[in-house]
C-alpha cells in the first residue's frame, strides 16, 4: 500500500464531546492514522443553548495529534447536518479523487483505514462499486471474507 496515496478523512462533528472524543480516540489507533490527512468540519450551533457543547468539541478538535495533518473547519453559521456534509465532501473532492467520510459517533477498528484505503484502490476503476463501507448490516449468514451487498446504497 502506497502510504502517500491515502484517502483524506472527513469527520463531521457538532455538539457531542463524548462521542467526538471516542471517535477520534479509536480513529487515531488505526495503523494508517499517522499517514492520513484529517479534515474536521464543525457546524455552528443552531441555538445559544448548544454553544457550550459545540465549543467543547471545537476546543478538543484544536488539540488533536496523531495524524499526518489536521485541518479543522469551523462553520460560522449553522448549515445543518446535510449541507455541512455535502459542502465538506465537495471541499475535499475539489483536490482529491477519493474520501473517507465519518460522523462523530463511529468507533473504528484499528484496521479500518487500511481496509477502506485498500478497497478504494482495488475498486477505483470498477463502475459497479460506488462506495466502500465499514459497516455491515446484521446478517444471519456468516461470511469468511468481505463481500458485496448489492443495493446497499
Kindly give the residue locations of the regions a language model identified.
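An acidic/histidine-cluster motif and surrounding catalytic segment
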Residues: 1-101, 106-153
Amino acid at each position: 500500500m502506497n502510504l502517500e496515496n491515502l484517502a483524506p478523512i472527513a469527520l463531521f462533528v457538532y455538539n457531542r464531546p463524548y462521542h467526538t472524543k471516542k471517535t477520534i480516540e479509536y480513529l487515531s489507533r488505526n495503523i494508517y492514522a499517522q499517514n492520513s490527512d484529517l479534515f474536521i468540519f464543525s457546524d455552528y450551533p443552531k441555538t445559544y443553548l448548544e454553544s457550550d457543547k459545540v465549543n467543547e468539541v471545537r476546543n478538543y478538535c484544536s488539540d488533536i495529534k496523531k495524524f499526518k495533518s489536521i485541518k479543522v473547519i469551523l462553520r460560522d453559521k449553522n448549515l445543518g447536518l446535510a449541507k455541512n456534509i455535502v459542502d465538506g465532501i465537495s471541499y475535499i473532492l475539489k483536490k482529491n479523487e477519493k474520501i473517507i467520510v465519518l460522523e462523530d459517533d463511529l468507533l473504528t477498528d484499528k484496521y479500518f483505514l487500511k481496509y477502506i484505503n485498500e478497497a478504494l484502490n482495488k475498486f477505483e476503476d470498477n463502475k459497479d462499486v460506488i462506495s466502500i463501507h465499514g459497516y455491515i448490516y446484521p446478517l444471519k449468514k456468516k461470511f469468511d471474507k468481505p463481500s458485496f451487498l448489492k443495493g446497499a446504497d
